[in-house]
């Protein structure tokens, strides 16, 4: 048997690849990190499948009750009741967050409260906020989006949801948590401090693009704060059905390149940038008058 000896070129290539591997970093996932020994239980209701670690049943039942109570309320302004969904609760983590995944369709909640927690219970606040995202995404399942769902499954909703701005998703969810809990972020003066401070300054207001994308030089609000102001202004000026109509437009016309902005213009006469200008003008007067005499 003849064994070919490695050439200098092959040895050099191998050493180069081994050297480069030293700079590789593994990916860290916030889900799927639960101990393998963890046993799971579930609670089944008409609208939810709540999956939770063994021993967490009291908090899981509490969360289930909150979700069932919010089911008819959180979707009222969008005129939508979503299909049944799985809710997975993680308690073996230090992360304080939650998210909704369109595919496979589910909610994941991390039960450890943040250090700067609100006065309302963390799981109550988190469950309502994330369930509003469920309503938003499930609302898109209509028209052409539903047809695409037969071809691409749940990925179709994820694709169409990507056409909608993050400020809408998060701002609208903050409205829901503020309306359905005792102390949602929209009720806190500190939540709007970045925009209030900017409006109180004598310099011109930042452009919509800068407020949307952020800045390394200037302090700008995140999409939660910006979105809360824009979505609440839209509801106040054009009715609670504005965002329902916009979502209907996006779900039925996902082929339009700027479907969200076109839908917003169709039902309010404003595009996203002009909505921002109008909202900041209104809030400037609202904050400077001490909230008096505004309607």
Predicted features, each with a name:
Residues 1-12:
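Bacterial N-terminal signal peptides that target proteins for export
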Residues 13-14, 24, 180:
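Cleavable N-terminal signal peptides
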Residues 30-35, 121-126, 134, 139-232, ...:
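Acidic/His/Gly-enriched intrinsically disordered linker/tail segments
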Residues 26-159, 165:
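Juxtacatalytic substrate-recognition/specificity segment
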Residues 54, 243-247:
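Short hydrophobic alpha-helical segments that form membrane-spanning helices or hydrophobic packing faces
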Residues 19-23:
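N-terminal signal peptide c-region/cleavage motif recognized by signal peptidases
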């Amino acid at each position: 048997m003849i064994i070919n000896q490695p050439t200098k070129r092959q040895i050099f290539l191998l050493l180069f690849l081994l050297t480069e591997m030293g700079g590789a970093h593994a990916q860290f996932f916030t889900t799927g990190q639960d101990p393998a020994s963890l046993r799971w239980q579930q609670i089944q209701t008409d609208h939810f499948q709540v999956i939770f670690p063994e021993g967490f049943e009291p908090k899981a039942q509490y969360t289930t009750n909150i979700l069932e109570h919010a089911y008819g309320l959180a979707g009222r302004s969008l005129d939508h009741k979503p299909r049944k969904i799985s809710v997975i609760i993680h308690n073996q983590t230090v992360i304080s967050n939650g998210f909704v995944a369109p595919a496979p369709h589910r909610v994941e909640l991390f039960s450890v409260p943040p250090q700067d927690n609100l006065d309302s219970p963390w799981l109550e606040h988190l469950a309502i906020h994330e369930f509003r995202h469920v309503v938003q995404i499930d609302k898109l399942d209509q028209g052409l989006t539903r047809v695409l769902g037969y071809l691409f499954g749940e990925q179709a909703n994820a694709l169409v949801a990507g056409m909608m701005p993050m400020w809408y998703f998060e701002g609208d969810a903050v409205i829901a948590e503020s309306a359905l809990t005792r102390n949602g972020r929209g009720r806190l003066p500190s939540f709007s401090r970045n925009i209030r401070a900017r409006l109180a300054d004598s310099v011109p207001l930042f452009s919509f693009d800068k407020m949307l994308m952020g800045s390394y030089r200037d302090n700008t609000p995140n999409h939660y704060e910006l979105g809360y102001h824009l979505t609440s202004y839209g509801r106040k000026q054009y009715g609670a059905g504005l965002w329902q109509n916009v979502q209907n437009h996006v779900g039925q016309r996902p082929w339009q390149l700027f479907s969200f902005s076109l839908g917003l213009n169709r039902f309010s006469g404003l595009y996203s940038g002009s909505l921002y200008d109008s909202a900041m003008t209104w809030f400037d007067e609202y904050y400077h008058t001490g909230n008096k005499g505004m309607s």
